[in-house]
């Protein structure tokens, strides 16, 4: 007789693709820590939803479309209130986690004056090598013979910006790894 205990995680990500990619390291950490014995309910905007296509542990996907007067939160509450979660990770700093049946709440509150990557790493104790590996492996499987990379050294908000030297370092690293073309 084998008993498999699942963690039920409610993961509320972003509407933007870039933000969702940043948040993905946290989801990967939960998967790694729970040895894939995890069931995830994902809430995300429609644009970044394909990022999660290969995540088989996502049992429910909810596209959150913003509405006037924040009515999207009431709609989301109606959709999720029948369920119980072991933990919520909320990158939108919403109040919904306080109204749902959740054992543990991780509400990410961005400090506008600090770097977002450092804030996420400190709050969730992510491991850059291990927690980005799932995404990297998936991209390699989708594009096995690709030999190019795209860098986008711009953001829509100052705390997400990296110093120019970081992009130069990434480009050098990619070239050292055999990338022939880098598009900016």
Question: Where are each of the predicted segments found?
Answer:
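Catalytic machinery of carbohydrate-active enzymes
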Residues: 1-184
